[in-house]
């Protein structure tokens, strides 16, 4: 009798399994050989040479010399400009190289009128040039006194490493053509108040750039932490939660529908984390649920402030003896951001991560817009979204979902070229959902969480109505 009862229980369990198992489909992703090629093309020796050149300018302080050809931020930015020009010449003029500039004055760290002049290079997309992904590093450097613009400030890791990585990404990616545009930016004025980023973000807003990801690289070369940890196999991705430009109405919606951990920036971070797992050997990325390091800032923030998705990519282990320090030795400790503190292979690894992430997003279609979700007091969940713009290379869409307590997507389903789909017997209350666009070649956009909390597109014309 006990045996028969066991059979009955087993039969009941087996009958219930197909409903659950069929609903929960493991994550699927098409491996892209071109992204493996891009990762392999990044060269540490070129990054080393670029860092050496940037260090050779003595100081790159925002208030430093601008007329000398050998010292100061003026010489540094002119060299970066010419380097972008050389890269463009190697790809048949595929880069539009320009300065982005404004006069800043009356600020705590820029009291007198100063031209804050950044250098950018734009690789225009072939089918959707108005859609952008952006990689940045910071030109300027500093010592202990943020207003000291004459002392040597090599800034080898902070942040010649980020600029060198951006130049190297441009060398590699300029050998390919993408659907969307890629921007490579060397930004000035970071240490004095994030002014280079503010100027470029405002330019993007004025010109209606559809920026879907800003990858700010600020210190990507240090592997020896001040805590004694030495590790070249991990990196951090900082990503804000709730968008800075969220309206009161949107905040109320988020309270009832969720989305505080699924901002566009967080889903860009998840995208980059997936790229690390698939294409960068021996690198594990840590997504940090914070705008930046505790109480600190970086050049992705001005873009976040306007509503653009943006993250900071950087080393895991910082060494504060090598940040914002006068060059000196005290009590046997060597202070200063010198080139001997940079691991060039590690910087190349993080540069490759940027390159494959930029390429994957630029080859993918635009992220879905106006994603909506329904399913309250229902056994199933329905998602809806707008069809991609005409001319987009779209094979269809993929729905992702995960338990509400999980940081990463757990399940996915390609649903074809439709704008509405119902996940049968998946209860809306128990999961977080999102939708990605998929190209004919299998490249995917970042995942979009339903509603305003997860929306990638920005309509600046509606700002006054918020």
Locations of regions flagged by a protein language model:
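Metal-dependent peptidase/peptidase-like ectodomains
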Residues: 187-298, 306, 310
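Active-site-adjacent mobile loop/cap segments within catalytic or ligand-binding domains
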Residues: 55, 220-241, 287-363
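A non-catalytic alpha/beta surface segment that caps or lines the substrate-entry region
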Residues: 38, 46-124
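Short beta-strand segments within Ig-like beta-sandwich modules, predominantly Fibronectin type-III
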Residues: 411-418
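Conserved aromatic anchor
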Residues: 379-393
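Extracellular fibronectin type III
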Residues: 440-465
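Beta-strand-rich modules
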Residues: 423-445
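Alpha-helical metal-binding/catalytic segments enriched in His/Glu/Asp
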Residues: 121, 135, 140-141, 145-194, ...
């Amino acid at each position: 009798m006990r045996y028969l009862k066991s059979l009955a229980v087993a039969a009941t369990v087996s009958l219930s399994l197909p409903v659950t198992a069929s609903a929960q489909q493991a994550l699927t992703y098409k491996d892209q050989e071109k992204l493996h090629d891009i990762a392999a093309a990044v060269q540490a020796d070129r990054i080393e040479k670029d860092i050496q050149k940037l260090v050779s300018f003595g100081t790159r302080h925002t208030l430093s010399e601008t007329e000398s050809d050998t010292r100061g931020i003026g010489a540094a930015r002119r060299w970066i400009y010419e380097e972008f020009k050389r890269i463009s010449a190697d790809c048949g003029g595929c880069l539009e190289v320009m300065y982005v500039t404004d006069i800043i004055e009356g600020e705590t760290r820029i009291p007198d009128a100063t031209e804050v002049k950044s250098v950018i290079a734009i690789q225009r997309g072939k089918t959707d040039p108005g859609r952008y992904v952006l990689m940045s590093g910071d030109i300027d450097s500093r010592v202990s006194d943020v207003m000291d613009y004459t002392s040597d400030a090599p800034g080898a890791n902070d942040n010649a490493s980020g600029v060198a990585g951006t130049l190297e990404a441009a060398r590699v990616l300029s050998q390919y053509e993408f659907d969307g545009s890629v921007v490579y930016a060397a930004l000035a004025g970071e240490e004095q108040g994030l002014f280079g980023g503010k100027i470029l973000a405002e330019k993007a807003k004025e010109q209606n750039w559809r920026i879907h990801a800003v990858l700010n690289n600020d210190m990507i070369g240090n592997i020896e932490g001040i805590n004694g940890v030495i590790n070249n196999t991990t990196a951090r991705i900082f990503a804000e939660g709730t968008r800075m430009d969220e309206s009161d109405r949107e905040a109320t919606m988020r309270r009832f529908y969720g989305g505080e951990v699924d901002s566009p920036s967080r889903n860009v971070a998840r995208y980059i984390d997936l790229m690390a797992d698939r294409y960068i050997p021996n690198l594990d990325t840590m997504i940090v649920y914070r705008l930046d390091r505790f109480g600190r800032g970086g050049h992705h923030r001005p873009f976040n402030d306007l509503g653009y998705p943006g993250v900071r990519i950087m080393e895991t282990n910082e060494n504060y003896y090598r940040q914002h320090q006068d060059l000196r030795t005290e009590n046997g400790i060597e202070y200063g951001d010198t080139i001997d503190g940079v691991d060039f292979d590690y910087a190349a690894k993080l540069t490759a991560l940027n390159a494959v992430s930029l390429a994957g997003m630029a080859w993918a279609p635009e992220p879905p817009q106006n994603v909506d979700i329904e399913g309250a007091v229902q056994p199933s969940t329905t998602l809806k979204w707008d069809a991609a713009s005409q001319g987009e290379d779209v094979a269809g869409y993929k729905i992702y979902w995960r338990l509400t307590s999980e940081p990463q997507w757990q399940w996915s389903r390609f649903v074809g070229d439709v704008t509405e789909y119902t996940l049968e017997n998946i209860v809306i209350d128990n999961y977080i959902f999102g939708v990605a666009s998929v190209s004919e070649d299998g490249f995917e956009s970042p995942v979009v969480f339903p509603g305003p909390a997860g929306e990638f597109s920005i309509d600046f014309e509606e700002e006054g109505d918020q």
